[in-house]
């Protein structure tokens, strides 16, 4: 019971001290030593400045009013009327100017550092060469395929697109064309209907073409190939 009464008395005494130390002025509080401290804050500018300690609460309140007027202008809340002019060379004024100057330099330095960091990161970014590599690979692949395709045409395509087994070398010799001198363009696909139109073999035909003409063995004629069409149409000139 005695312990509870003692604790209650201590709490009441602490509340009295807090009420006594609480100032009626804005930005002023009493320290444990009995002196009054003034401090100003501005959350919009992220500023907190210590104005010093004073013997009386009124002196601390006037210091706060001066700093608030210099920082926020005439629309700020003050403890006393600020109609009188405030000297620009007062200690509080000089202290506040130095604080604002250091703050602006710090902000400018941070912005420059951010710009430099962004610029260096962009300049040092690796260039994606996958597209160029892919293009080069495609070009080399196409080049090799073209070479292979040309070789294959010269060696294989003639027999594949000659379903009737016509001996092209014998035909060339019969019409006076020496081997390896005839250039045939097989780059176009052979239409299916052209294959169906090929004539059937018989004894009376000794030269074969693509539904164009045929020549009996007794006629003297000149023949030449159309190199711009698959399986080279055989044209007759009398």
Curated annotation (Swiss-Prot):
- At the top level, the lineage of the source is Eukaryota
| Keyword check for Transport | no
| UniProt induction comment | Induced by Nod factors in root hairs.
The entry's DNA-binding region feature spans: 24-81
| CDD domains found in the cross-reference section | AP2
Where is this gene product found? Nucleus
Which protein is depicted?
Ethylene-responsive transcription factor ERN3
Give a Gene Ontology cellular component term annotated to this protein. Answer: nucleus
| InterPro entries tied to this protein | AP2/ERF_dom (IPR001471), AP2/ERF_dom_sf (IPR036955), AP2/ERF_ERF_subfamily (IPR050913), DNA-bd_dom_sf (IPR016177)
For this chain, the family text in UniProt reads:
Belongs to the AP2/ERF transcription factor family. ERF subfamily.
UniProt keywords (A-Z) are:
DNA-binding, Nodulation, Nucleus, Transcription, Transcription regulation
Q: Name one GO biological process term.
A: negative regulation of DNA-templated transcription
What tissue specificity is annotated for this entry? Answer: Expressed in roots, root hairs and leaves.
Q: What does this protein do?
A: Transcription factor involved in symbiotic nodule signaling in response to rhizobial Nod factors (NFs). Binds to the GCC box (NF-responsive box) of ENOD11 promoter. May act as transcriptional repressor of NF-responsive box-containing target gene promoters in root hairs.
Q: What is the lineage of its organism?
A: Eukaryota, Viridiplantae, Streptophyta, Embryophyta, Tracheophyta
Q: Which gene encodes it?
A: ERN3
Pfam families according to UniProt = AP2
Provide the GO MF annotations for this entry: DNA-binding transcription factor activity; sequence-specific DNA binding
